[in-house]
């Protein structure tokens, strides 16, 4: 799963603003902001945002044992 911190990091890594991500995921800018603040979103909305970021080359990682999380950026996304 993706959390709000990962969303913000992924968006920054891609050089996207809140508006670009919102438009790509067909959600409001307020929805993206709420996610990045740590508020709960409906599963379908969260999945839509995550899928857009994954299609742009982001891989979400998390370590269940200690709660660590982050992102990976596929090399092909850095062109």
What are these regions (language model features)?
Residues 7, 21-22, 32-35:
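Conserved hydrophobic/aromatic packing and binding residues within compact polymer-binding modules
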Residues 58-79:
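Helix-turn-helix/homeodomain-like alpha-helical modules used for DNA recognition
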Residues 26-41:
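Recognition helix of helix-turn-helix/homeodomain-like DNA-binding domains
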Residues 1-2:
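A detector for short, charged/polar N-terminal pre-domain segments
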Residues 12, 26, 43-61:
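DNA major-groove recognition helix of helix-turn-helix/homeodomain DNA-binding modules
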Residues 20, 35, 42, 55:
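Major-groove DNA-recognition helix of helix-turn-helix-type DNA-binding domains
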Residues 5-20:
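Short basic helix-loop element that most often maps to the first helix and adjoining turn
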Residues 12, 23, 37:
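Alpha-helical residues within the helix-turn-helix
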């Amino acid at each position: 799963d993706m959390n709000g911190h990962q969303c913000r990091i992924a968006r920054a890594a891609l050089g996207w603003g809140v508006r670009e991500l919102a438009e790509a995921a067909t959600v409001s800018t307020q929805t993206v902001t709420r996610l990045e603040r740590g508020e709960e979103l409906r599963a379908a909305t969260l999945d839509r945002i995550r899928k857009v970021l994954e299609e742009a080359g982001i891989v979400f990682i998390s370590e269940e044992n200690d709660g660590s999380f982050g992102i990976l950026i596929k090399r092909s996304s850095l062109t």
